[in-house]
Every structure is written in C-alpha cells, then in structure tokens.
Amino acid sequence: MKKLLATACALLFISGSLILVGALPARAADPVPVILTERPHMGLDGTFYDDQLATLLLPSRRLGQLVFTPSRINRVWYIDAALLDQVAAMVDGYSVRVAGKSGELVSGTGMNVAMSWLSALKQVTRMNPVLALPYGAPATHWLEQLAPNELHFYEANSQLKVGFYVGKYVDVTPSFPGEKTPRIPGETQDTYNFIRKNLKGYLKVVDIQDTNPYRLGIAQLTNPALNYDDSIRLSRAFLNDFQVFNKRLRIVVGKYTITSEREKIPMTIVNGFNKDVTVSVVVSPLNGKVTVSPIRDVTIPAQSKLIVPIKLHIIA
C-alpha cells in the first residue's frame, strides 16, 4: 500500500472507524534566557561608588541592549532585584562618591536613562516568564550551609521586588544558566558574617527601613560573578558603611575618678535613628571589688541622647 504524505492532516483507520487527525504543530523553540544581574555600584547607605550604571543602561550598552532592543524571540528573564533597586535609586536622584576624597559627593547623571530603562523593562517582560533570583544573585549553595534563613529572606524579598518592578507575579529561582562557581575570599566571608550577626541586635528595635538595605545588601558579597579584587574592594566598602550605621546607636565612653564607697557616674547613650529605641544595658566591672546595681531597660528618644546614672559600690 502506498503511503501518502499529508501536509494538513492524516487519515487513520482504526477498527473500521475513520479518525481525522490535525497536523502536529512544530515544537516551539526553547526560550532564550536573559540574565539581568550586575555587580553592586551602590553602597549600603544608598550612595553610589561610581556612575557606571548611567552608561550601562544606555540603549547601546549591555544592560540597555537587553531591555531596549525589540525581539520576537521567546525569552525567559532571570532578574536580580538588587540591580532594579539600584536603578530605582537613580530615578529618585542619587549621589556618587568622589574617588579619593572621603565624604565628598557629586550628583549622578543617570536619572533619565534609569527611568526609561525601568519603564522599558516592564513593557518588554510583559509577555515573557520572569524568574526572580535571590537578592544580590548570591552563592546559594554556600548560603544554604551557612545562613539558610537569610537565603529564604533574600528569595522572598527579591520575588516581591521583581514582581513590583515588572508589574506582575513572578516565580523565584535559586540560580540562572551559566552561573559561575563561587570562590568567596576569606576576608569577604568574614565581613558577611560580621555584618549579618551584628545586625541581629537591631532587627527588633529599629525600623526595617533602616536595617533592610544592610541585611539585603550584604547578600551581594557572595555573588559568584565577583572576581577576587572586586570582592575584597566591595567587602571593605560595605564594612565601612556598616560601621557608620553601627555608630547611630552607641555609648559615649568617659573617664571618671571614684573617690567614695558609693558613686554615681553618668553614661551617655546616643540614638541616631528616627525611632525611640529601647535597649538593655549590662555593665560588667573588671575590678572584683566593684559592684554595679542592675539597670532597667532604657528607652532613648529618636535622634537624641540620654544620660543614664550608673550606681557603683566599692567593697573595701
């Protein structure tokens, strides 16, 4: 029996029945992955280390080409919310640190291109699936062992943020195709752990608006795309940023001479946050002949100083 090739349909005879089968459509090509990540250009305090993003977002440059260039190719987007947060910060007007001049800032130049880029991103991803990477595109396997709760925090926040920027629900994914194997320098690991552990004390006493930029931002330290030099440079910059943050709630140290068996010495606590902060104060004398009366929890009003008397008893 001759076989007939049909382009539109085929006729099948099964048990005397005639079945009309439509031609099978060609299988759609696998979607092309588009990766939107970038090394950090913004410090934990919201100021920028450089103004390179203003160039990278241009239609002719890497990040701009991915968003501004129209394409009919089926794509799937892997997006890091840390990049989008940096671009959004540019839209609001931003300051760039002057290299080699501590404390000196200049205005950034990328406000308009950042606004256009975010608008174009929302449009270009409208018909494509979008996957949110954990915040900062960090080394997920490393974090799973060291700080799994923080990894979940990075995933949840990035999913919400990316969904907000693209204007639709997005899923979360731990990594993207072609991600590098992490090689995190020891100094960078130490910085990440130091900031993460010291932030814990602030989480219950100050607003998340104050802590989240630091808690989320340090995830970028573990990004596998950072080379050794960039990792060390970023580690030291983030550590400096956190040390400034850490001084917003502090005790002013003083020197006093004790001349009697019972003394009261003043201790000044400074609160640089925009919220009243309640802290527990523990004073431990180094001299075994000195005892200190217990101190109740102390509430320091926002943006103020409070003097707390420390009662000492000298044992003869």
For each predicted feature, which ranges?
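N-terminal membrane-targeting/anchoring modules of bacterial envelope and secretion proteins
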Residues: K2-K264, T268-G272, V277-A316
